[in-house]
Curated annotation (Swiss-Prot):
Pfam families: malic (PF00390), Malic_M (PF03949). Gene3D superfamilies: Malic enzyme, N-terminal domain, NAD(P)-binding Rossmann-like Domain. NCBIfam families: PRK13529.1 (NF010052). It catalyses: (S)-malate + NAD(+) = pyruvate + CO2 + NADH; oxaloacetate + H(+) = pyruvate + CO2. One of its GO terms (molecular function) is malate dehydrogenase (decarboxylating) (NAD+) activity. It comes from Salmonella newport (strain SL254). The lineage of its organism: Bacteria, Pseudomonadati, Pseudomonadota, Gammaproteobacteria, Enterobacterales. The keyword GTP-binding does not apply. Belongs to the malic enzymes family. The gene is maeA. This is NAD-dependent malic enzyme. Keywords: Metal-binding, NAD, Oxidoreductase. One of its GO terms (biological process) is malate metabolic process. GO terms for cellular component: cytosol. The record marks 270 as: Important for activity. The keyword NAD applies.
Length: 565
């Protein structure tokens, strides 16, 4: 963790007594000094000893270790977050590799499923459809006036778990925790939001503890009008906001991104963030093998908005490497539950239509099947890269992986579905089926694989390598939009930090302990590209770096001075 080179300015605080202790952004707990306890009416409300934040963090770490299940650890950390945010982030940064899977995937999935059961205290904004006409008033109720990043979900497609209704709030909370822990964005600048448009999850509707609007999901024109009211209210309240769409259903994710990306500074992490980290990983893996991404044939299992978003960014990258658009598209094969996407397949979604293969080019394939399965595609394409974004467990079978390995000595296999229970194949199986020759990157965290007395580290293709840096870059540069080129610059920067590329060994992605360094580098690349593209005011490189440093928040207590409201 970086240390400050100069003492931070004092904060002037209008709150005192129990009110101050109940304010998570300002509460220091036992770390309030003797003078602060006297000035803020805290004398006698805290134990005698004045502790440092490291002493507090050590106690919290010991308490954390006493919990045996991941969900109990998650609940404990969320309680600290809702009590003392500075301590929460110091603790998480001290133990990032241990705690990141607890505050986010995979544990956050269980927290979303059990949201109403484990609910302790409100965090963020809940906007239900019955309150749609009070949108402006609701946002005015947010006490933080300087919000810079919103993560919003409607809870319909939470990870691979489907419709979790209001329980989806766990995702924006977790995501914004990583914006701060990994990207240094002050928690005072962040706001999680859930749009409660009902739920089609009958189990939730029947649950007496369910805290959301008990109604089937609104759809079509009503739904889009509601989202539009929200967007307009956000623009009115915080005109310079960065808005991240998160875990919207496939039918809504791409239309919302397309509709609003040129109206408000926004992006969809499931589509664009996943694509950026995947492309960064593939660039690094290709370079480590002495080749380029444009030389690879790539097969996808899963042709939803996330899979197609990754495919389009791969195509853009291979065009940058010199391929024509037609040649780039001929190297990418999309398979969904109906088989390979072809130009004769009916009822394709608009974002799928550009990713079809021409049936005329498949006449020579060795198959008698009308529907071209994943095995058919792997057998005939002989891919170098296999990517899973299906949300269905076990679909990368032994037969498929062994067939791929027949024709590719060092296959790259990326089962990216979340959470762990939905992964297309486990790293252990993939390593065994390829005789230890596969390079594996997963969406959820996995322990290193031991096979024939050799240890194989498993890279987690985690969006947290990308979105915190993008957020920091947008804030530091004042970018008004997030362009495709800004996302590509993030991918390229991530690839440049690959230990496998730089050292010839190790993981294809940086260690999590280095994620703040990576986020700062991505922030600079994104901010610079924003300036080049005219969506941010041009400054010198030194000024941009200074803006990044100035906006990089550290979990350290500041001295307080008393003032009136």
């Amino acid at each position: 963790m970086e240390t400050t080179t100069k003492k931070a300015r004092s904060l002037y605080i209008p709150y005192a007594g129990p009110v101050l202790l109940e304010f998570p952004l300002l509460n220091k707990g036992s770390a309030f000094s003797v003078e602060e306890r006297r000035n803020f009416n805290l004398s006698g409300l805290l134990p005698e000893v004045v502790e440092s934040i490291e002493e507090q963090a050590e106690r919290a770490w010991l308490q954390y270790q006493g919990f045996k299940t991941e969900i109990d650890k998650h609940i404990y950390l969320r309680n600290i977050q809702d009590t003392n945010e500075t301590l929460f982030y110091r603790l998480v940064q001290n133990h990032l590799e241990e705690m990141m899977p607890v505050i986010y995937t995979p544990t956050v999935g269980a927290a979303c499923e059990r949201f109403s059961e484990i609910y302790r205290r409100a965090r963020g904004v809940f906007i239900s459809y019955p309150n749609r006409h009070n949108m402006d008033d609701i946002l005015q109720n947010v006490p933080n006036h300087n919000i810079k990043v919103i993560v919003v979900t409607d809870g319909e497609r939470i990870l691979g778990l489907g419709d979790q209704g209001i329980g989806g709030m766990g995702i924006p909370i977790g995501k914004l925790s990583l914006y701060t822990a990994c990207g240094g964005i002050s928690p005072a600048y962040t706001l999680p939001v859930v749009l409660d448009v009902g739920t089609n999850n009958q189990q939730l509707l029947n649950d007496p503890l369910y805290m959301g609007w008990r109604h089937p999901r609104i759809t079509d024109d009503e739904y889009y009008a509601f989202v539009d009211e929200f967007i307009q209210a956000v623009k009115q309240r915080w005109p310079d906001i960065l808005l991240q769409f998160e875990d919207f259903a496939q039918k809504n994710a791409m239309p919302l991104l397309t509709r609003y990306r040129d109206e408000i500074c926004s992006f969809n992490d499931d589509i664009q963030g996943t694509a950026a980290v995947t492309v960064g990983t593939l660039i690094a893996a290709s370079r480590a093998a002495g080749s380029q991404l444009s030389e690879q044939k790539i097969v996808f299992l899963g042709a939803g908005s996330a899979g197609c978003g990754i495919a389009e960014q791969i195509i853009a990258q291979t065009q940058r490497e010199g391929l024509s658009e037609d040649a780039a598209r001929q190297n990418v094969f999309m398979v969904d539950r109906f088989g390979l996407l072809t130009d004769r397949m009916p009822n394709l979604l608009p974002f799928q239509a550009k990713l079809v293969q021409k049936c005329d080019n498949l006449q020579h394939w060795d198959t008698e099947n009308d529907v071209l399965s994943l095995l058919d595609v792997v057998r005939n394409v002989k891919p170098d890269i296999l990517i899973g974004v299906s949300g269905q467990t076990g679909l990368f079978t032994e037969e498929i992986i062994r067939e791929m390995h027949k024709h590719c000595p060092r296959p790259i296999v990326m089962p990216l579905s979340n959470p762990t229970s939905r992964v297309e194949a486990t790293p252990q199986d993939i390593i065994a089926w390829t005789e230890g020759n596969a390079l594996v990157a997963t969406g959820s965290p996995f322990s290193p694989v031991i096979w024939k007395d050799k240890i194989y580290p498993i890279a987690q293709c985690n969006n947290a390598y990308i979105f915190p840096g993008i957020g920091l870059g947008v804030i530091a540069s004042g970018a008004s939009r997030i362009t495709d080129e800004m996302l590509m610059s993030a991918s390229e920067t991530l690839a440049k930090h690959s230990p496998l590329v730089n050292n010839g060994e190790g993981l294809v992605l940086p260690a999590l302990k280095d994620i703040q360094v990576v986020s700062r580098a991505i922030a600079f690349a994104v901010g610079k590209m924003a300036q080049q593209q005219g969506v941010a005011v041009k400054t010198s490189a030194e000024a941009l770096q200074q803006a990044i440093d100035d906006n990089f928040w550290k979990p350290e207590y500041r001295d307080y001075r008393r003032t009136s409201i």
